[in-house]
């Protein structure tokens, strides 16, 4: 009997002092050992006295697709990795709860006011190339589409936020002529990948001249690898802007921890890991490492509202799919 009482007491004590676990759905490059995830996990766990479980999925659009499938039964408390183009669709899903985050100090191009989604970084889409291999990069998106000598890789707009970003970029420039542009681009497309990591890895392996990424991506090669040959091609039509966001789920089992994480997300401890971890721009005054000043400057930011994207995304994806499968 004494033994049973001791075991029971031990179990109760373990349960009483077991740390709570916050489960976050995000994308694979965020959780990678070279990404910001490991350091952010360590810093937040120290602050909250909890466990942070970062679940790596393919990419932003795929994360929203999974949440729709799981519904209120999702194991996630919070999602990190959607972007501003998906806001209206995400809200229409009814899966997300309002945040309690104080947004003072957030500095996002175009401003930010939203009661559900909190931004944590931003950037601009660009095609990356190796200047030692590609001596004359295209100076516009139209030149990239029309040049017969280029091989490119990009991501699927049905699963990837960069892939969706290219679709919006193409639409913002070509308008009703976008299907013809997609057909032309398909002639020089090596492959379309589900997510960013796969596409970028193939580019680094020499399988294409250019890959869809961000204007800030060369900072990684310059700062972490001392390889200045990787560059972002500056396009005269402008570059499409992306703001990445996080939000709490209505079904969150750890709602208070989710609120705490969202506030932590715009603190120096989180934001300082963004430039040299996620290789994007922070949404606060967090300092940029030396080397970022060499990144191209975007003078013509392009964007649609999330309502415009929600109203047209299915049709625009259908346009893309029909064009690339001809």
Regions found by a protein language model. Give the residues of each.
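Mature extracytoplasmic/periplasmic domains
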Residues: 249-304
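Short alpha-helix C-terminal cap/hinge motif
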Residues: 38-54
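Extracellular/periplasmic bilobal clamshell ligand-binding domains
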Residues: 291-326
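A bilobed periplasmic-binding-protein/Venus flytrap-type ligand-binding module shared by bacterial periplasmic
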Residues: 126-133, 171, 242-254, 273
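Extracytoplasmic ligand-binding site segments that recognize negatively charged/polar headgroups
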Residues: 21, 25-37, 58-62, 75-208
């Amino acid at each position: 009997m004494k033994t049973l009482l001791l075991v029971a007491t031990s179990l109760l004590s373990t349960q009483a002092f077991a740390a709570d676990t916050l489960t976050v759905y995000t994308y694979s490059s965020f959780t990678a050992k070279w990404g910001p995830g490991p350091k952010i996990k360590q810093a937040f766990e120290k602050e909250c006295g909890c466990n942070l479980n970062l679940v790596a999925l393919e990419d932003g659009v795929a994360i929203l697709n999974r949440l729709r499938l799981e519904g209120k039964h999702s194991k996630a408390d919070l999602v990190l990795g959607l972007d501003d183009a998906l806001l209206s669709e995400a809200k229409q899903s009814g899966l997300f709860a309002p945040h309690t985050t104080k947004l003072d100090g957030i500095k996002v191009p175009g401003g930010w006011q939203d009661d559900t989604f909190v931004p944590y970084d931003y950037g601009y889409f660009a095609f990356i190339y190796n200047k030692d291999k590609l001596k004359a990069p295209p100076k516009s998106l139209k030149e990239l589409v029309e040049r017969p000598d280029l091989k490119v890789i990009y991501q699927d707009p049905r699963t990837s936020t960069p892939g969706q970003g290219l679709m919006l970029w193409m639409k913002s420039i070509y308008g009703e002529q976008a299907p013809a542009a997609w057909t032309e681009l398909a002639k020089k497309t090596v492959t379309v990948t589900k997510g960013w990591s796969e596409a970028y890895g193939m580019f680094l392996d020499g399988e294409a001249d250019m890959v869809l990424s961000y204007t800030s991506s060369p900072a990684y090669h310059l700062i972490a690898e001392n390889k200045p040959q990787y560059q972002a091609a500056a396009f005269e039509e402008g570059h499409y802007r992306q703001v990445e966001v996080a939000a709490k789920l209505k079904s969150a089992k750890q709602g208070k921890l989710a609120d705490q994480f969202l506030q932590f997300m715009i603190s120096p401890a989180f934001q300082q890991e963004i430039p040299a971890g996620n290789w994007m721009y922070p949404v606060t005054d967090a300092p940029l490492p030396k080397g970022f000043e060499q990144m191209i400057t975007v003078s013509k930011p392009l964007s649609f509202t999330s309502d415009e994207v929600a109203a047209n995304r299915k049709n625009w994806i259908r346009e893309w799919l029909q064009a690339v499968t001809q």
